[in-house]
């Protein structure tokens, strides 16, 4: 199924060079970048180089030798998010970042039966489950914000739900199970207009690396990110933005000696976001993360976003022509995450057929986002997530396999 020739890539990126930089392109058609992206070779080379240094001179000594470069990783991440490196804390995943923020808020608050926490209806399970625990044990009220007519979080509905009992607002920028983009900056402005004291947590694990994200403009107190998805860093890495308000009012719990000093009279904490970090890290992974971020910065986030928007838009157009396929993505603007299902063929069967053809995609099921799946009557879906190194030909091959696998079933339906 060929691409409409009216659709053109205006990113200006050298796709041949991008593929040469990405060794995995020679092995697979990787369309699972919302799961874990193929890294550019510079990421792997950077990690291996540091591991070899640890092998030869010892871990502490290798850390000391690479100290200057390690310290610049936060600055690179700050540049990616249009903020200062002093507002960046390193972690092991987006969930690790999010949990550190959430526990700090709980540690500073007197949560009880009157406490309300508002969450987007498309929120990911790992962000909802801790709130459900507070609800079970402390009586905290978890409420989901309705979607608007386009299928994204309704800012007006959120404003009507705000009162002094709202302790936190939890929003994902781009959910894992749909191509929608939530209006996180508009929500931040709404909270400011209402002069709400609620803490604003944004899960940006699927947006950073594929969309330009200005953490300050979003207005979040915390913005959590993983390294392994669209940033194209190694697994076991993550980071978060911490606002000046968060740094002035919140302490991590439990404290760690990386960001906290034990003094004769008690303890003191760092004034920057490193107070939220743990002392122990894989510095090879940290350096790999830095290499991935620098690679993205060198390409330019506008160019990356344009390329991904082109590919995902083309894919949606092609899938929409396959009989029986429903493209599920909502919202006016859409991310690089493309989701669909078929009227008679299970998503898992389509994913298996694609895997057999050497194409990596994911299957989505309700346990990852119960409210969203139930509200939209979806029992399972196929998620396809291209990145800059993918080609139109790979997308055409993907759609061809989907069409072949579902064709006979559609004829019998």
Language-model-detected regions and their locations in the chain:
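Pyridoxal 5′-phosphate
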Residues: 1-413
């Amino acid at each position: 199924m060929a691409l409409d020739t009216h659709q053109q890539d205006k990113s200006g990126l050298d796709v041949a060079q991008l593929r040469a930089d990405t060794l995995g392109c020679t092995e697979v058609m990787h369309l699972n970048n919302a799961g874990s992206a193929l890294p550019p070779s510079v990421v792997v080379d950077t990690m291996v180089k540091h591991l070899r240094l640890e092998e030869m001179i010892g871990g502490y000594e290798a850390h000391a030798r690479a100290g200057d470069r390690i310290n610049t990783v936060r600055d690179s991440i700050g540049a990616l998010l249009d903020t200062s490196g002093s507002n960046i804390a390193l972690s092991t995943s987006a969930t690790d970042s999010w949990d550190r923020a959430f526990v700090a808020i709980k540690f500073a608050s007197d949560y009880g039966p009157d406490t309300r926490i508002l969450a987007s209806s498309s929120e990911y399970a790992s962000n909802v489950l801790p709130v459900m625990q507070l609800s079970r044990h402390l009586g905290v009220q978890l409420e989901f914000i309705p979607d608007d007519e386009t299928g994204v979080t309704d800012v007006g509905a959120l404003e009507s739900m705000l009162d002094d009992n709202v302790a936190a607002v939890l929003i994902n920028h781009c959910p894992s199970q749909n191509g929608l983009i939530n209006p996180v900056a508009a929500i931040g402005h709404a909270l400011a207009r209402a002069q709400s004291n609620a803490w604003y947590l944004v899960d940006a694990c699927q947006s950073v690396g594929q969309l330009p994200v200005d953490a300050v403009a979003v207005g979040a107190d915390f913005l959590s990110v993983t390294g392994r998805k669209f940033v194209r860093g190694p697994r076991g890495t993550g980071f978060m933005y911490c606002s000046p308000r968060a740094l002035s009012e919140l302490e991590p719990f439990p404290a760690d000696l990386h960001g906290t000093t034990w003094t004769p009279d008690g303890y003191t904490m760092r004034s920057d976001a490193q107070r939220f970090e743990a002392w122990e890290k894989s510095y090879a992974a940290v350096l790999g993360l830095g290499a991935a971020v620098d690679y993205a910065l060198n390409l330019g986030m506008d160019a990356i976003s344009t390329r991904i928007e082109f590919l995902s838009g083309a894919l949606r157009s092609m899938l929409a022509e396959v009989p029986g396929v429903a493209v599920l993505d909502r919202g006016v603007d859409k991310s690089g995450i493309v989701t669909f299902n078929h009227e008679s063929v299970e998503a898992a069967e389509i994913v298996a057929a694609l895997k057999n053809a050497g194409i990596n995609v994911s299957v989505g099921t309700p346990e990852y986002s119960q409210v969203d799946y139930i509200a939209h009557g979806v029992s399972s879906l196929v998620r396809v997530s291209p990145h800059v190194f993918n080609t139109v030909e790979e997308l055409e091959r993907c759609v061809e396999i989907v069409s072949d696998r579902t064709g006979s079933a559609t004829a019998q339906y």
